[in-house]
Amino acid sequence: MKYFIIEIQATEDTATVVTPIQSESSIFAAESKYHQTLAAAAISPVPYHSVVLLDSLGRAVKEPECYIHGGSGSEE
């Protein structure tokens, strides 16, 4: 079974989807990579960063983890 880590990084005017594909056969290896990605997201400079671990059928293995970093705070 393959696992995919989907990373969504959003800046003020763009949203980028970064998809490092993890082809480990072990869920433990995929989970390890998932937690490493979460740790990187926690210190990411982008305002919004979401990470989700999916199985090969696109089903979420873990619920999305989101980090919303501080910004100007103004909403219009």
Regions found by a protein language model. Give the residues of each.
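Solvent-exposed serine/threonine-rich low-complexity stretches and specific carbohydrate-binding patches
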Residues: 20-25, 64-68
